[in-house]
Amino acid sequence: LHIFFLHEVSYQKKPIFEMHEFPERLNLLGHRITFLQFDEGFQARREMRSPSSETISGRVYSNAKIHLITPWQFGMPSLDRYLATIVTPFVTLRKLLNDRPDVIVSYSVPTSGWQTLILSKILRIPFVYRAIDVSHKIRKSRFNWLVRLAERFVLRNADVVSVNNPAMARYAIEVMDTRRPVEFNAPPLDLSFAVRPTDQTRSKVFAKYGLEPEDKVLLYLGSFFYFSGLGSFLQKFAPVLKRREDFKFLLVGGGEQEDELKSLAHTLGVSDQVIFAGFVRFIDIWPIIGAANVALNPMTPSDVSHFALPNKVIQYLAMGTTVISTRLEGLESVFGGCDELILENDYARMAQIAEREMLATRPKSIPAAIERFEAEASTKSFETMLSFAAKREDPR
């Protein structure tokens, strides 16, 4: 199959998750992959960037080949996102006409998703919407109501809606207001990466981040979004850090909250124990997770977090690391009942649990629920769904 993926983020800069893993694994199975990105954060000092088309090596699997398309951008991040809704369809239409795919898979909604859906109807190309979050809740904007309309349009008119967890399926069905089935396809987890670190590897991780051998590490991995809950948790965890000098809070990633979190750590007097590691390579996250005593997912409970399935939690659990998380519907629908996942919405109580678990000495264990994300099986499920969609004579 020729599969045309699109998303409203940068393929080359975004931390790795299923938008990289599915296309690259499908390419390794023999499918031709085109990916339309939006290079968020691109800045140009002198001139706009014309549409580009290039073949790149995979970010997860270097032997995979992805044909990457980048539309016009003017180098003004605050303006480019809005302009992209207008200019991207022209690039997309040209590509669809000149190199017609068998099926389109969209992670995108407002930037390029609804426009590509309209084009797919005109050209009679099957359109799959991969719903992994609630689009109109991701960013705070005066235009959220427009994003909500676009999301409803995409959900109600896509030929197939594929979700990554049962809670997201319930949300999609409610918005679709139809009995049309929703496909559940688990995101792929390549367990070949999830190797327990040796003592030597653990020592290297500790040395890299200035940790002492006797330190206990609480890990947060991912983006620092406004709904991450990191600030609220840190305020409650600071007294624990002050009481326990051997406790360290390691934050791997970055985002819009980073400066605010650094300032908060300084104000609370714990900046020496809160370590900002920045983004790391995909291959390097696994020994970090394995070296941590406890991992954290303090996302503020809301629509955007309830219906998502945080990739970091899957990675934490795959390494046998105990996870403390707010109680989120998506997580509970998949991992509910797992002893390795502790759910708590009160941040003060969460800080107490973190202290208890960081001092615990029980061996690490991997929950059985992780098996449903096994990469080969999940990719095969996704491939089967796409093959079925591509063979429809009348995608309407």
Question: Residue ranges of each PLM-predicted region?
Answer:
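Donor nucleotide-sugar binding/catalytic pocket of nucleotide-sugar-dependent glycosyltransferases
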Residues: 37, 148-202, 274-276
